[in-house]
Amino acid sequence: MAMDGFETRQRTRWRTPEPEAGALRHPTLAEIRHVPGKRGLPLIGVMPEVILDPLAFSDRMVAKHGPVYRFHALGKWHLHFVGAEANERILFDEHGIFSAEAGWGPLIAPLFPGALLVKDGAEHRSRRRLLGEAFKQAELSGYQRIFARDIERRVESWQGRTIDPYVEARALTFHIAASTFLGVPLEEEAHVAIHSFAAMMGGLLTLVSNPKLSLVRRRGFAGKARLEKILSRLIEEKRASPGSDFLSRIALLEDEDGLLPVQAIADSFIFLLSAAHDTMASAITSLTYYLASHPGWAAAMREELAAAGIDDFREAATATLPLLDMFYKETLRLNNPAPVIWRRAVKDFSIHGLDIPAGTMTGCNLMMTHRLDGLWHDPLRFDPLRFTPEAESRRSRFAYVPFGAGVHKCLGMHFSQQQSKMFLAHLLLHAELECRDRRPPSWYHWPNCRPRRSLSVAVRPRCRGK
């Protein structure tokens, strides 16, 4: 959305380049018939199966076709790749074969044209370097103070109740979005901003991409427009009187031409907000459920905190706590917030003896790699001891990549890890959790991992010294 009064120089900086016409074309069936797979229904392909249960669909495809398979969806052929070798080849991308812009662009670019995820090459490096300034440890410490306050207030409201972790996690991340990221109180404008954001995300995920044909898509664009308007004003206010919130830090970023254009900041910030909001809600839900379901691990982690002399959960953010780290890693292995990472091949390549043509949509299926027999013993069992130093040394480092890998590795990885450790430590120090579900939950793995049905966790205050 262009903004009135912008100088020409501001409008052109960080501009999203138009793709070259005909630079890439999607492969025909004849070109990839040698890759095993499935066409599905006319036009929509396998989308009904994928939407019904993404994990079950992937599990069937891997069982029948192996670690590389094709499927037809919405008029195009796509390939999924499973395994550590594919993660290394595609995500690390040593030879520059894969484009994140062309892979994620069709899904993300209509609503997030300025997102870091849909940039490649020099433009990506420049943006990542600038935005990385907001993720340095000194900055993270400022965000943590705000985040800690939100955790204390929200988790205190859980005490003595039986909660649905996903509902509560969404409420918590609502507060975090307003305070840690936007730096505004939870008043009317914050509610408008976050509900606009929710409408925007709904518009992103609808299968009908044309706003003229989809009410959900129109609401998405309208929500983004409202959010941009609010952000534009907030950015100017933050520049005049910055705080310790995330938006204040980004608003003050400069390149060789000075302060970044407001629109460029808004574009980048909106996507960072969306990624943090959804992935954090997913992680907090899963951490709460698994903590309630594994009291033995809860006791062991409490002993670890006591041995480290930690009685303030804030200290856990940067402390060396191997058991907490292993618990967190195992949670993300089973319930990865980003189940699939998309790229598109810009050159021909070969993998597992298969020749793949340029133009192919290539997805690294992390949810299946993280459950792959051979990489993981008894892969569906929750077992944080998979992540002892000895166990990790026997595995490829690309077997576990919850935040991606290579130049597009999640910029907020350390932020997410530190917030999750603080959250875990607060629950361990201040609450006793008990899972009340009679059967294991079913998880839905798109676009982020979340439970299919309500979960039930009883929370009661913990007697200190217990």
Where do the PLM segments sit?
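Cytochrome P450 catalytic-core helices
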Residues: 279-298, 302-304, 414-429
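Conserved cytochrome P450 K-helix/beta-meander segment immediately N-terminal to the heme-binding cysteine loop
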Residues: 364-391
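N-terminal membrane-proximal hinge/A-helix region immediately C-terminal to the signal-anchor transmembrane segment
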Residues: 2-126, 145-153, 378
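Cytochrome P450 heme-thiolate monooxygenase catalytic core
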Residues: 2-5, 19-35, 58, 99-106, ...
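Cytochrome P450 proximal C-terminal region
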Residues: 2-23, 31, 35, 62, ...
